[in-house]
């Protein structure tokens, strides 16, 4: 007679798991609780499930007046989020193929990622994984090099996280990465655990050498708080009409430990594009704002209004919620946005709505402006000009990556791993300077210097606190001319926080190599600030 085997029902197994889970939680054993939730995260089927697990774990571990947000974030990212996966990408070097398209390797093979929009939460197989799951926080750097987290997404309100007086950061696990060239291809790989040649992200280590379980990147481009202090949060006008020196001065008002944007952010953002989309550059995948350069004169004049009348065709190019200036040429002939009279009526104001109006039997589109001050307009004289976006444009995107309406239109900021990029203005890096020179053969040279301790960043000069990146010098023949080149490949830099070209040329183009431009303004000497990304209308030259 055959032996009878009684298999437990699914409900019985769930009950046993629940009992075991309750026992571990009741024990109060920190290591056991973290191991339990680590296994639950690895088994999760969606990012929403991981979000729920995070809240559950946090509530179990939080002890009012005892634990801190810093402590729990360190535990979650450093211990709970863990796996043995290796994520990678393989891309052709320009000499091998001019294609910008690579391929996923290792455990990334088969994973699918499609940028999302406000209307659609598209597939992102990476978001739920330990190495890619991300969390928004409100935080501040301290003068001693440490930092303090004041609010945490899913635990505190979004107003406290995104719109407080503090800086909004996005945290992600501090993984180990390695980048190298081999056999005509570029390889980039990421993992949770140490391995030969792998290093942690530089933004996961503070100036004291403390290595954290997470990295922190700003969620938004810098903007002004309601009190006029520079910061990083949602719903803030951009910092423009400003130089490297101006920006450093603005950040120093916030604290001596601040100086501004870091090149480390761009290096990480492009790495996320490469790992998730197997592309050498972001252009054409998540474009960012590269082609939103519009200027129109009023189709009809009015007095005491808060709007500009345009034709229907003109208004169709504008987005409600985007930023504009309103003014005229004054006594001059230039309609450049830097001319003060061009923003004398409204400066960095958002479009509140676009409505149909009929005046004197003629149909117009009224572009209504968020402003407290009414103004007069004159047909053919008053200009309305698009400007860089306020922060938070992509807050409504239903995913980690994408753009509000179209990731490929070039008309709006992009989003990668929950951080906004390319808002329509150059990003002036605080911690990098470029220096022109000439070598012994009479060729032009362009060297890069970095200062990653923002308290030591200077304005206009390279001091002993800066490090020359000896492996990154670009050389241009004495016969070359000023102008745009395109980046064939990025460099595998010794400084892991630097994004810099390995080679630029006129052979590469907007659809090949890294799909990004690099302007060459030849000089025999001189220090230059590092302007990255693009203004409103750089189109094919623009990229991370």
Question: What are these model-predicted stretches?
Answer:
Residues 330-347, 435-443:
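Short, Lys/Arg- and Gly-enriched loop/turn segments at beta-strand edges
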Residues 55-98, 103, 426-434, 459-544:
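C-terminal, surface-exposed recognition/capping segments
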Residues 1-45:
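Short, low-complexity N-terminal tether/leader segments at secretion or assembly junctions of large
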Residues 302, 309-311, 319-323, 344-361, ...:
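Low-complexity, serine/threonine/proline-enriched polar segments
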Residues 159, 163-166, 198-329, 342-422:
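Short aromatic-cysteine micro-motif
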Residues 21, 25, 36-226, 250, ...:
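Extended N-terminal export/anchoring regions of large proteins
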Residues 143, 283-303, 375-410, 439-478, ...:
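Surface-exposed intrinsically disordered loops and tails
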């Amino acid at each position: 007679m055959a032996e009878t085997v009684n298999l437990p029902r699914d409900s019985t197994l769930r009950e046993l798991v629940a009992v075991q889970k309750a026992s571990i939680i009741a024990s109060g054993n920190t290591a056991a609780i973290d191991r339990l939730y680590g296994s639950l995260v690895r088994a999760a089927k969606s990012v929403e499930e991981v979000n729920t697990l995070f809240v559950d774990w946090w509530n179990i571990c939080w002890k009012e007046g005892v634990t801190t947000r810093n402590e729990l974030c360190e535990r979650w990212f450093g211990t709970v989020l863990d796996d043995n996966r290796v994520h990678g990408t393989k891309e052709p070097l320009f000499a091998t193929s001019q294609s910008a398209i690579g391929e996923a390797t290792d455990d990334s093979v088969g994973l699918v990622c499609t940028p999302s929009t406000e209307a659609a939460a598209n597939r992102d197989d990476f978001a739920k994984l330990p190495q890619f799951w991300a969390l928004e926080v409100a935080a501040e750097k301290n003068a001693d090099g440490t930092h303090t987290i004041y609010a945490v997404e899913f635990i505190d309100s979004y107003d406290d996280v995104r719109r407080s007086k503090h800086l909004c950061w996005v945290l992600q696990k501090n993984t180990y990465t390695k980048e190298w060239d081999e056999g005509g291809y570029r390889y980039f790989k990421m993992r949770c655990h140490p391995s030969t040649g792998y290093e942690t992200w530089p933004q996961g280590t503070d100036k004291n050498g403390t290595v954290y379980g997470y990295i922190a990147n700003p969620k938004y481009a810098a903007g002004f708080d309601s009190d006029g202090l520079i910061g990083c949060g949602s719903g803030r006008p951009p910092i423009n009409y400003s130089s490297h020196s101006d920006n450093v001065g603005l950040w120093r008002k916030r604290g001596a430990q601040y100086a501004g944007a870091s090149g480390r952010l761009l290096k990480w953002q492009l790495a996320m594009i490469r790992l998730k989309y197997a592309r050498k550059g972001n252009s054409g995948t998540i474009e960012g704002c590269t082609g939103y350069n519009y200027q129109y004169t009023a189709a009809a004049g009015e007095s005491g209004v808060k709007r500009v009348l345009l034709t229907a065709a003109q208004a169709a190019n504008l987005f409600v919620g985007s930023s504009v200036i309103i003014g005229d040429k004054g006594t001059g002939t230039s309609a450049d946005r830097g001319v003060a009279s061009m923003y004398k009526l409204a400066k960095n104001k958002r479009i509140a709505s676009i409505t149909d109006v009929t005046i004197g039997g003629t149909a117009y589109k009224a572009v209504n402006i968020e402003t407290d001050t009414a103004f007069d307009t004159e047909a053919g004289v008053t200009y309305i000009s698009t400007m860089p976006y306020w922060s938070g444009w992509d807050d409504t995107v239903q995913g980690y990556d994408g753009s509000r309406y179209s990731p490929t239109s070039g008309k709006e900021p992009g989003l990668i791993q929950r951080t906004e990029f390319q808002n329509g203005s150059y990003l002036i890096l605080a911690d990098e300077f470029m220096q022109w020179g000439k070598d012994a053969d009479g060729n032009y040279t362009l060297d890069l210097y970095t200062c990653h301790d923002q308290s030591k960043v200077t304005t206009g000069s390279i001091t002993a606190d800066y490090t020359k990146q000896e492996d990154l010098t670009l050389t241009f023949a004495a016969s070359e001319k000023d102008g745009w080149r395109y980046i064939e490949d990025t460099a595998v830099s010794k400084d892991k926080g630097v994004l810099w070209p390995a080679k630029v040329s006129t052979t590469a183009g907007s659809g090949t190599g890294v799909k990004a431009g690099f302007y060459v303004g030849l000089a025999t000497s001189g220090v230059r600030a590092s302007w990255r990304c693009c203004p409103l209308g750089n189109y094919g030259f623009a990229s991370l």
